[in-house]
């Protein structure tokens, strides 16, 4: 808990993230399960050192937020334990110009070439690509994928 203590002492809101079934873990369930720490396990560990209460978060938040009374807040992005796909409003744009609508989908849409088009052509094309990317989102829960998080800027 040293990192959480460090953040609480300085007023930083730490985010923990559950391991996700991405990259090599998408197909290797044993490796995933050996490394996975669930939301409940994490809260159990934190509870040994701190009292905490669940705090409010926006409807489309990816993190479940908690308050350590008198000390600060922390959050857990727990997509395996508490899937948030249904309310996810995020899109990701890679540094190479690819738009990703969902971490669970290998679909991607290239927007880099729109930079060379005049505005009256680029905007409708961008709107179409945004709609396609939003259509890539999972309905209920993250299902994993071969995409590696570092490629899409998770």
What are these regions (language model features)?
Residues 50-104:
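C-terminal accessory regions of radical SAM enzymes
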Residues 1-73:
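Radical SAM enzyme [4Fe-4S]-AdoMet core and its adjacent flexible, acidic
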Residues 80, 86-154:
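Flexible mid-to-C-terminal extensions adjoining Fe-S/redox cofactors in radical SAM and related proteins
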Residues 1-6, 15-19, 24, 39, ...:
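N-terminal, helix-rich and Lys/Arg-enriched segments in bacterial and organellar proteins
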């Amino acid at each position: 808990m040293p990192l959480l203590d460090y953040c609480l002492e300085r007023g930083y809101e730490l985010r923990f993230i559950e391991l996700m079934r991405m990259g090599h873990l998408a197909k290797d369930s044993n490796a995933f399960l050996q490394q996975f720490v669930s939301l409940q396990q994490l809260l159990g560990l934190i509870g040994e050192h701190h009292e905490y209460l669940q705090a409010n978060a926006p409807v489309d938040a990816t993190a479940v937020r908690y308050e350590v009374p008198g000390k600060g807040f922390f959050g857990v992005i727990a997509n395996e334990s508490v899937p948030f796909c249904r309310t996810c409003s995020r899109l990701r744009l890679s540094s190479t110009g690819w738009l990703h609508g969902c971490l669970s989908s290998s679909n991607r849409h290239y927007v880099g070439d729109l930079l060379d088009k005049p505005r009256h052509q680029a905007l409708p094309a961008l709107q179409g690509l945004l709609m396609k990317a939003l259509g890539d989102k999972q309905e209920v829960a993250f299902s994993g994928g071969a995409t590696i998080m570092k490629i899409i800027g998770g």
